[in-house]
Structure formats: C-alpha cells, structure tokens
C-alpha cells in the first residue's frame, strides 16, 4: 500500500487545485451577503462576536481594511463583528465598508428592534475616503455618507443620520444643496424631526460622484438656529462600465525587417468607473490576429501600457514574402486588472508592414530590339523591369538613364507611371544615310535609394539595338526660305532666281521636278526641270497680296520615287518702291459762311501709297486755268498739309476748286482733284477756322467739318 501513497496524494492535490481554480473562475469581488438582520439584544457585550462577514477581492484580500459606521464596533481580520464596549442602543442601521487595493464593497446591518439614538454620533461613517474633517465646536454632528451606486428598490432608504446634541425643542432639521433643492432635485431628503438622511432613487457615480449637501436646524418659522454644516455624500463605485476604445481607427506602421521588440503603436481604452479602484484598472491582450501567417503570434501587447510590439524575427517581417502586408488585431481591454469577472471592450488595430527599398529593379532581358523609320519621332520600344518592392512607393518606381550611345541627344527615355516600363523615344529624326544602326546602353534605378546592404547589379543595365529603316524622303530646298530683292514694276519675264533642292536619298539617284505651290497674285512661273523662277505679270508693291513690301510664294520639289516624295520651299520677294502712285487730297468737300469774317475754308491733307522719298513733302497748288484769280488762296502749312482760304466773301452757292498736288518722287507725280466748297447762310452760327491749328489740325476734325458742310446742301 505504501508505494501508492504518493499517487493518492498527487490525485488529492490536483483535485484541490482544480477546485481552487474553479472557485477563482466563479469569484465575484465584494461581500458575499450584502444585508444582514440582527435582533436588538438587551446589551451588546464587549468583544463578543455578533456575526461573521465574508468579503473577497478575488486576489487574496491583501491589505484588507474594515470600517464600521458606529464607533462602538469593529470588524476583526477574520470578518467577525464585535462591540468595543458594552452598549445598549446603536440605532436602527449599521454599515460596514471593506476595501483592498483591488475591490471595495459595503454591507448593511439592520438592527431589528433598534431605536433611534439620541446622542453624539461624531464618528458616523468614519471610513470616508478622505481624511475626516476636524471636529469643530458645534452641536450638529455630521459625517460623510457612503452609498453604493446602482442600488435597487425599495426606495427611499435610510443612509445616515444627523444628530444635534443641543437641539432645542420643536426645532427641525433642514437639508439643502445639489440633489435636494437644486438640480437634480429630490435625490436626498432628511427627516426634519429625527435627522435621518435617506436616498430616493438609484445613484450613478459616473454622473455625480460626490454630493455636497448642507444641514442646518431651524425653528418652527424656518429661521436658522445653527448651521449650515457641510454633509458630503460619496457614491461608491460599482463595476458597471465596460472599457471603450474612443480614438479609432487605430492604424500602425512598422518597417519590414524591423528588429524584434520594435514598438508599432499604442492602444488606449477608457473606463468610466472610479480610476482609484480596480473597476477602471485595465489590462490588454490580443484576442485574434488576421492573417495568422507566417506566425500566429506576430505581435505582443503590453498588458498594462497597451504598447504593441513585434515578437518575430526580422526575417519573418519580409513584406515581399508575406501573403498580405496588412495585419488586423482584435485588441481586448478588460477591467478588474484582467480578472475573469472584469468587463471587456474590443477594438481593431490595423498594422501595415511598410516597404523598404531592399530589392533593386532588374531588366527582364539583357538586350532589346527596336526599329524606326528615318525621319520619324516618338516611342520606339518599351523596356520592361521587375521589382519586388511596393508598387505605391519610390522603392518600386523606376528611373531610366541612357549612359552610352546617344552623343547627338537623338534619344530620350521616360518612365511609364502605370507600368513602370521605360519608354525609349526618338526626339530628333534619324537619317538612314547617316547611320542605319544605333546601340544604346540603358541603366535603371529606383527613385528611392537602396538600403545599405543592397546594390545595383548587372541586371540593372540593358542594351538596346536600334535599326533605322530607309524611307523615300522628300527633296530639301536650300536655302529655305529663299530671299530676293527686286524693284516693283520690273518687266514681265524677268528672271528672279533659280531654286535648288536636293534629295536626301543620295543612294537612290532620283530626279527632281519643280512646280508652283502657292502664288497668291499669280505673278510667278518656275521651270520644272532647272528650277528657274521668272515673272508672268508686273510686280506691284502696293498690291493687297504684299505684306510690308514682301511677297511670299511656295514651290514644290518632287522626286521620282515610288511613291514620289515632295518637299516645299518658300520664296520671299522684297519689292523696292518706285514712284508709280500719284498723291491724293482729303477732304474733298468744305463749307464756309457767306458773311464769315474769317475767310479760311479748309485745311487739306495729302497722302501717297508709295514709300519715302516718293511721297512728301507735297506741293499744293490751285489750278489757275480753271478758276479766276484774286478769289482763292492756298498756303502751305507743313510737308503734308495746306490751308485753302478766300480772298473775299462769296454768294451762297457751290464752287468747284481744282487742287493740284505733286509728290517728291523722281520723276514726280501729280494729281488734280476738285475741292467742292459750299457757301452757306449761317445765320447766328459761323465756322471758326482759327480754332484749328495750322500744324495740329487732325484728320477726324477735317472729316467732321466735311460732314457739317453737307447740311448746307
């Protein structure tokens, strides 16, 4: 039998441990019984046990303290309630408050048959959380009242008592303050005769934790006799609030390859319960990790601080090998310091594994081929690369560079932002006859620098072979534009120049023919064989087809290819002016009053389509063969204007005065124009020719004067 004794002991010990564990799982902090009924004896005997109270904080009751609302009783460490001396009357109710660092609770002892005591209760509710207020010399005796929140019916229920040892007869107690006669009103009341304080409804510590009331005694007329004296009502916290995560969404980032123990983020929950108790003492844990690969425990959370840290090796934090670089953690916060009886709240923490540039881009091929027609520009080939880094970062985005084979800067390469490919383009047309083949060396790098232990290798460079295809190119005029200067009015058939166009396709030995492409005035002809350009009409500098003395024509050069190619050349003919336009005067109508004292008629201006020196100074004259002398006079004002005036008044009539104007060309050209002068009866009005300065008379004023003269017709 002896050999079996250790086995039996082990079995018994395991049963005890299992039972203890089960009890811990079912443990609820506080008094196991909240209300006790005690029959009032003839006398409570000193040190005699009255009843046993059972309190547990589910953590061993370390630093357990008991406090009784009556100074005549105490609770021993074993939970036994005893009297401190012989006493007969203790009132109708006692309260016992138990407290540890982890929990607290209050039990009510109802004295069946007890009577209200008349005497000093100076230490009622002595166990207030704050130090008792020093006793003052007064007859009203009050102590703080402690009331658990969330009490149930019945209400009202007595929670304390106020005593006035020197209270006059017929005096009354009066209670005031927030919770009595101030909002929220009617929570507390006092028996005006006995001083019993009662609560009328359930209290919520998270709404109001402490009520500051005042007690006073009054006479029958309501006049204050003593007081007011402060009365503090403290609401005892119950664990009735779950932890709440209020600051979401919670998103953290950690760089791939980070060392074990790297802090990612902090989770903080809030509990509305009393922070001085375990009701608001939180502990954190990770309930779930998604995905659960490569390890179901990629992260750890500090149970007290809420810091989330990595717990796997840096090799497992490789973004490129993870199925998903995003992890979601269900974080649970539990009050009561994490005991099973604690309330819980959860939140989701999203952790992103951020990329670092630990992979260099690599070309998918060492060599690429491209073809392009000579003369063409644009993209000729897309170079493809592979990069395992995050496509949304500069660790993936490629930057290409031509490092050899581009001395003429005929090529450029840019990155396609969608595909990350290198788009190689021709930006300067290539000539087959110059070079039919080109070889470029291209390198690729990332926008972001590589991490120190990674470098660009041979796969980060590639060769591009480009073949230039021969095409039938159009002939090219040289020079272009072609410029000649000739006098206008040269004789028809005059040779202006011989154009010259060459064929870039020098190896094909093609012939070239010429033709007129654009000749707005129809003045030119070109020999289709030798390119000689001559005139078919008189060249006129004043033609509307001439712009600023320059006439523009276009010619074609067409080769003999199949199909033929065409080139265009521009001819700019600068026409020199000759005096081929006579000047003209303005205005051609004037008026004057028949009784005018000022005999000035009009200021004449002259203009010429030719250029200087074939224009002004102009010479103004009256054609004397057509009009009598001693009636009209013309006087020069400046190079372009003259004043016409009368030598005597004329009768009302219309007069035609021939004006002869001559330019300064060699030979000069003359024009005779009739000036129509209207002599009017102006009544009280008159034309004031002096108002117009001889040198500053403007063309708009002359036109206005001409319009006014029409009124005399």
Swiss-Prot record:
Residues covalently joined to lipid (GPI-anchor amidated asparagine): 690
SUPFAM superfamilies to which the protein is assigned, alphabetical: Cadherin-like (SSF49313)
Pfam family of the protein (one): Cadherin_pro
One GO BP annotation of this record: cell morphogenesis
Glycosylation sites: 52, 86, 382, 489, 500, 530, 598, 638, 671
GO molecular function: beta-catenin binding; cadherin binding; calcium ion binding
InterPro entries given in the database record: Cadherin (IPR039808), Cadherin-like_dom (IPR002126), Cadherin-like_sf (IPR015919), Cadherin_CS (IPR020894), Cadherin_pro_dom (IPR014868)
CDD domains assigned: Cadherin_repeat
Residue stretch(es) of the prosequence: 23-138, 691-713
Cadherin domain ranges (all copies): 139-245, 246-363, 364-477, 478-585, 584-690
Localization in the cell: Cell membrane; Cytoplasm
Major place of residence: membrane
Membrane topology: Lipid-anchor; GPI-anchor
Top-level taxonomic group: Eukaryota
Keywords tagged on the record: Calcium, Cell adhesion, Cell membrane, Cleavage on pair of basic residues, Cytoplasm, Glycoprotein, GPI-anchor, Lipoprotein, Membrane, Metal-binding, Repeat, Signal
PANTHER family registered for this protein in UniProt: CADHERIN-13, CADHERIN-23
Known partners and oligomeric status: By contrast to classical cadherins, homodimerization in trans is not mediated by cadherin EC1 domain strand-swapping, but instead through a homophilic adhesive interface which joins two elongated EC1-EC2 domains through a region near their Ca2+-binding sites to form a tetrahedral, X-like shape.
Biological role stated in the UniProt entry: Cadherins are calcium-dependent cell adhesion proteins. They preferentially interact with themselves in a homophilic manner in connecting cells; cadherins may thus contribute to the sorting of heterogeneous cell types. May act as a negative regulator of neural cell growth.
Official protein name in the record: Cadherin-13
